[in-house]
Amino acid sequence: MKNVAVLSGDGIGPEVMEIAISVLKKALGAKVSEFQFKEGFVGGIAIDKTGHPLPPETLKLCEESSAILFGSVGGPKWETLPPEKQPERGALLPLRKHFDLFANLRPAIIYPELKNASPVRSDIIGNGLDILILRELTGGIYFGQPKGREGSGQEEFAYDTMKYSRREIERIAKVAFQAARKRNNKVTSIDKANVLTTSVFWKEVVIELHKKEFSDVQLNHLYVDNAAMQLIVNPKQFDVVLCENMFGDILSDEASIITGSIGMLPSASLSESGFGLYEPSGGSAPDIAGKGVANPIAQVLSAALMLRYSFSMEEEANKIETAVRKTIASGKRTRDIAEVGSTIVGTKEIGQLIESFL
């Protein structure tokens, strides 16, 4: 039995998760009997019910599962809590660390029908865009020790530590090279080797691994500031973009914006064993929660990534992705991706349309 922990969370999470599970079951067909979907509380709703953003029973549910399908967490209601008790820091970050979800895959796709939704000129986008940002997720300056604040007055200071081991760099680089082999066979590694010692080491390790195991894959390097510019002026040069944690955090958000809607973008966070957490790239959007207008496509595509990476069900994953493309081509859109001539529909209608193409 394939167990999936379903953590809908807060805001629009429950309503888009409902659509994703329905699409998932339709795509699986008779194979749905091989799956068990078990729900757990996480984030703000978990705080309200248990006092903790990641209750022990939810963590146990995840440990007994093969994958986590995650919605979104957070909202104004919980913003005044201590940082470690807030939904994202108290739930999502501990889940990543607990399961060693070191590889974050963030596709940034612009479908031809949606190229006018991008803030980037249509002549730059051409007939669409397909970039995969590969971000190291459990190391670097976000987790490095020591960190803290000391002193007082004009002598007060704060510090963080940016640190990477050879093992951490090699394992994320391997995922990038392996992903590139299934795409357009090109990796762009991002660093700041003209300033940072960790970046010098990062670049050295990536080059060594490339020569030893992946010489068939095209490899090039960009400083992070240049990469941020190139994503805007010439995004089609990229296939797989390999980044350490902080650089990947920034560049993946930039890449998501050039697609025109963050409501379209899924993500996968994977461990070495293949265990994964799958979630939309956007937030909980409390301002539109419960109104039936949220775009469920990112959650649906996250479910497709789960089938691909945690269960090796490529055919079913492709079916969902094809159904999403056909839905977009039909001209019916949620309001975040609507343009002149398209028909604006709600969350449930988009879900029904996706299912009609399965």
Swiss-Prot record:
Annotated positions for site Important for catalysis: Y142, K192
Pathway: Amino-acid biosynthesis; L-leucine biosynthesis; L-leucine from 3-methyl-2-oxobutanoate: step 3/4
Superkingdom of the source species: Bacteria
Cofactor: Mg(2+); Mn(2+)
PANTHER family xrefs: 3-ISOPROPYLMALATE DEHYDROGENASE
Keywords of the record: Amino-acid biosynthesis, Branched-chain amino acid biosynthesis, Cytoplasm, Leucine biosynthesis, Magnesium, Manganese, Metal-binding, NAD, Oxidoreductase
Gene Ontology molecular function, alphabetical: 3-isopropylmalate dehydrogenase activity; magnesium ion binding; NAD binding
Pfam family, one: Iso_dh
Source species of the chain: Leptospira interrogans serogroup Icterohaemorrhagiae serovar Lai (strain 56601)
GO cellular component annotations of the record: cytosol
Residue numbers binding Mg(2+): D225, D249, D253
Similarity comment: family membership: Belongs to the isocitrate and isopropylmalate dehydrogenases family. LeuB type 1 subfamily.
Catalysis: reaction(s): (2R,3S)-3-isopropylmalate + NAD(+) = 4-methyl-2-oxopentanoate + CO2 + NADH
EC number: 1.1.1.85
Protein's job: Catalyzes the oxidation of 3-carboxy-2-hydroxy-4-methylpentanoate (3-isopropylmalate) to 3-carboxy-4-methyl-2-oxopentanoate. The product decarboxylates to 4-methyl-2 oxopentanoate.
Disulfide bonds: none
Cellular localization per UniProt: Cytoplasm
Main localisation: cytoplasm
SUBUNIT field: Homodimer.
Cofactor details (free text): Binds 1 Mg(2+) or Mn(2+) ion per subunit.
Biological-process GO terms, alphabetical: L-leucine biosynthetic process
Residue numbers binding substrate: R96, R106, R135, D225
Protein name as annotated: 3-isopropylmalate dehydrogenase
EC category name: oxidoreductase
Residues that bind NAD(+): 75-88, 283-295
